[in-house]
Amino acid sequence: MEFGQHFEKVYMIEKPNISDEKIIVALNKNYSIQASEIEFLPIGNDASAFAYRVKTKNQVPYFLKIKTGIANLAGLFVPRFLKDNGLEQVIAPLSTKTQELWVNIDEFAFILYPFITGNEAMQVGMTDAQWIKFGSVLRQIHVTELPSDISQNVKPETFVPKWSNIAKELQEQVNTQNFDDLYQKELAIFWKENNETIQTLVERTETIGTDLRQTDLEFVLCHADIHTANILLTQERDMFIVDWDDTLFAPKERDLMFVLAGDSIHTREEQMFFDGYGNVKINQLALAYYRYEWCVQEIGDFGKRVFLTKDSGESTKQHSLEGFIELFSQGDVIETALNTPFESEIRNHS
């Protein structure tokens, strides 16, 4: 199974606190777009981002992402650079009238993209040819050298798991407090039932991270969230890679973990991918780190939405609870991580 496959579910979110009228005015002022239709899309797995489909009077569609701030400028500059330098499979932000890749409106950041009509590869699957193409495109990304004015905005991997402290805070809260909220109460019960597993995930992530900070590793340009829910396929079989928000410099295993099977048996899709990507040496310790870190991130993120985020609505809490529980399902990311060897080993993949 592809690592991260629980993303097949979409976690609904509420609309941001900004009117449609204000959005339309902002698009006209900053992008010279006269929107005639605007539709909120309750999709995505990012609690700080909101999606809209916008249509102009000429029926030209756009995809508008509204964020509560931009934490990683590389997520804008890198796809724009890749697109401008011939990587057609990249969806990049469009420029404003002043040639910026975003515009600040009140407490929000507006980012406008072309609207691609298609389906997530995770939902519809990919052909052998598309898996090969995916491998080839990711290899191109990994060997890309960025100019200094862009690379200075790309953060390097630190191997310090940023969600670890939040997971610990939540674990302390769950084990010491009582809850009246229905979703908090249900998640607290489930969390306590899985206390030992969660503790193991956090401890192993931190331990492996410490080891990797003392290891000489090659860093490449990584998308960092390149599961197949972030690959769009059109009816014409074109492929587009979206959601570059987590872009960073890191070992290639950061991206390859989404493709490598959870066991030693190579799936057909995995083999097709590497037919396109080419021969590669896999650092087993780095692969283990990213699988464990991903689990801790999901535990912290879903848990935070239920316990810590004050403006989480009922829908967000419900879907976050479901997402949290699903992490522990057979064959999902936690089982895959726990079955990943975490000794220092390099293995060839071809």
Predicted regions, residues:
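Juxta-kinase regulatory segment immediately upstream of eukaryotic protein kinase catalytic domains
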Residues: 2-39
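ATP-binding glycine-rich phosphate-binding loop
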Residues: 33-56
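Active-site acidic catalytic loop and adjacent metal/ATP-binding pocket
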Residues: 47-55, 63-64, 93, 203-256, ...
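ATP-binding pocket architecture of kinase catalytic cores
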Residues: 57-153
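A glycine-centered beta->alpha junction motif in the catalytic cores
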Residues: 110-124, 172-184, 296-314
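A cross-family kinase active-site recognition segment
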Residues: 124, 128-192
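ATP/Mg2+ or Mg2+-diphosphate-binding catalytic cores
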Residues: 173, 300-350
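Active-site activation/catalytic loop segments of kinase-like enzymes and analogous catalytic loops
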Residues: 252-285, 292-310, 320-328
